[in-house]
Design a protein with these regions (language model features):
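Beta-strand-rich N-terminal accessory domains
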Residues: 481-517
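Residue-level marker of intrinsically disordered, low-complexity segments enriched
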Residues: 3-6, 10, 478, 488-490, ...
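Catalytic-domain carbohydrate-binding cleft regions of carbohydrate-active enzymes
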Residues: 21-418, 425, 437-455, 459-476, ...
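Solvent-exposed residues in well-ordered beta-strands and their adjoining turns
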Residues: 432, 469, 481-483
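Compositionally biased non-globular segments, especially hydrophobic aliphatic-rich helices
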Residues: 9-14, 333, 430, 439, ...
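Glycine-centered coil/turn sites that cap beta-strands in beta-rich domains
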Residues: 425-433
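Bacterial Sec-dependent N-terminal signal peptides
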Residues: 1-24
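Generic detector of low-complexity/intrinsically disordered segments
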Residues: 9, 14-16, 435, 456, ...
Length: 517
């Protein structure tokens, strides 16, 4: 009997232990609330208004909130706007640095400005991040870890690949809510929180932030019904939620900040976190340890809103592309000149030129959705950068060409190929000659004769075409020799062009109507 009672007691203890484990309180669902004051660099106003009013409102209002509310954390993106704070509001800028060191003013977005990510080249997007991170390191001793683009008009499949290879771990936006139609089943986005895999398999975390202009009226957010509902939209039992202002900068309302403070201390069913824009991403690191995270492969694009911007303001897009190409060519030539000990690398000039035009890749600037007045500033900056890049390219090529072996029998001509692959094409060149030549012959660096044609001679200048071949990011020397007679005379009449091989007849429209050999 005693043995029976002892066994029963042991069973009760085991059951009691199991019961105690099952009655442990469940973890509360989390609400990551992210304070922001998204500021359009240009839109319905120009950059002068941004600096004079919106940048000032942003730094001054948030400094007041940071002093008054100890749990308040503010997130702000765009290195160029921090540079304007430093230049125009230096006292407030120095005060802001203290809160950055404390982790309460958070550098979001990693980039020089919150750029469009569909029109710019991959090189530009990487430069944008590189320039932003460089500024943050030099000024604040920190780096950002996320892509923070609340207001762009769509996101290509290359973005997670670019971000991951730049050392970033996450991306957030609210713009997909602006779609007219569902994109993924009944939703406008694949999930509210998950992993976005890029074209090469690299992944970053994605969080949907909902409306960036959200306000609360001095309530306890730990009991907020909307946040409780939003956290059910993901099996992760949490919500990532922007609050603050959009477009004009400034700060969240006092009522909103008080609501967050009350929520942090509240006893409701939600755990409220006054979060940096990247805290959610850091909490899930490393991602390989979280198989519960859904994964998406593909693009995150808009369907109606903003889509027309990719064909508007064509001049702006032309200048931008010219700067991308000229900047790349200038960089290549400058690096080569330094490598050959012919010139010092003009790092500050190139950095200034990149910064000047890249901030105009902002999502309301390059895209063509700003007021006409704004583009007077944009075009001016684009042309200044083009001139800076052109000067670096020209001086670098000249310094290299000056050391090349150009000892030829005739007139030497150096051709430069700025592209990253070999080019064989017809090159038009101009040389100085004392008199009009009757014929020309052109030889390459190996002494091989190449096809050439004299186009024109006037005012001591001869224009000619050369069938040229130039290596990738390289140079080629050609030897141009003149002769007293043409090797292959050409007779030109009203409608015919004839030499010893061909006779071509043109019709009234200038089209070839016959070709005889």
């Amino acid at each position: 009997m005693k043995r029976h009672i002892a066994l029963m007691a042991t069973a009760l203890l085991l059951c009691g232990g199991s019961y105690a484990q099952n009655t442990q309180p469940e973890k509360k669902p989390k609400a990551y609330v992210v304070a922001d004051a998204h500021l359009d660099t240009q839109w319905n106003w120009d950059v002068q208004t941004t600096i004079k009013h919106h940048v000032w409102n942003t730094i001054s209002q948030n400094l007041l909130l940071l002093k008054q509310y100890p749990d308040y954390i503010f997130n702000f993106e765009g290195g160029v706007k921090y540079a304007w704070m430093k230049e125009y509001y230096p006292a407030q800028y120095e005060e802001m640095k203290k809160y950055i060191r404390e982790g309460r003013w958070h550098i979001s977005g990693a980039s020089w400005d919150a750029n469009d990510v569909l029109v710019p080249s991959t090189e530009s997007v990487i430069r944008n991040i590189m320039l932003g991170q460089e500024y943050y390191r030099q000024e604040f001793g920190v780096e950002s870890t996320d892509i923070f683009l609340p207001d762009c008009f769509g996101f290509g499949w290359t973005l997670p690949t670019i971000a991951a290879h730049c050392g970033l771990i996450g991306f957030s936006s609210q713009k997909l809510d602006w779609r007219n139609k569902p994109f993924y089943g009944k939703n406008k986005y694949p999930f509210t929180i998950g992993l976005w895999k890029g074209i090469d398999g690299a992944s970053i975390m994605f969080a949907h932030g909902y409306d960036y202009g959200k306000r609360w009226d001095d309530e306890d957010l730990s009991e907020n019904k909307q946040l409780l509902e939003l956290r059910t939209r993901t099996p992760l039992n949490m919500v990532y939620r922007y609050y603050g202002t959009g477009d004009i900068g400034g700060s969240p309302t006092i009522g909103s900040v008080r609501s967050v403070e009350k929520g942090i201390k509240g006893d409701g069913p939600l755990e409220v976190i006054s979060a940096t824009s990247d805290q959610l991403f850091k909490d899930f690191q490393p991602y390989d340890n979280h198989p519960e995270l859904p994964v998406f492969n593909g693009e995150l694009l808009m369907d109606v809103h903003g889509t027309g911007c990719y064909t508007s303001q064509a001049a702006m897009k032309l200048y931008n592309r010219q700067n991308e190409l000229m900047g790349d060519a200038a960089e290549r030539a400058a690096v080569t000149a330094e490598w050959l000990n012919q010139a010092s690398y003009p790092g500050s000039t190139l950095s200034e030129a990149w910064k000047r035009f890249i901030y105009h890749q902002f999502h309301d600037d390059l895209t063509g959705t700003s007021i006409p007045r704004a583009y007077e500033f944009s075009w001016n900056d684009e042309l200044i950068s083009l001139k800076q890049f052109s000067n670096v390219l020209t001086s670098s090529i000249r310094s290299i060409a000056g050391q090349m072996d150009t000892r030829v029998k005739g007139t030497p001509v150096i051709l430069y190929n700025a592209l990253g692959f070999p080019v064989q094409d017809i090159a038009e060149v101009e040389i100085t000659l004392p008199s009009a030549p009757k014929g020309i012959t052109v030889y390459d660096m190996n002494g091989k004769k190449v096809a050439a044609q004299l186009l024109n001679y006037a005012d001591g200048k001869a224009q000619l075409l050369i069938d040229a071949s130039v290596p990738a990011t390289g140079y080629a020397v050609y030897d141009i020799r003149t002769s007293g007679s043409t090797n292959n005379p050409v007779d030109v009449a009203n409608h015919t062009i004839e030499n010893s091989i061909y006779k071509i007849t043109l019709d009234e429209n200038g089209d070839i109507c016959s070709l005889l050999d």
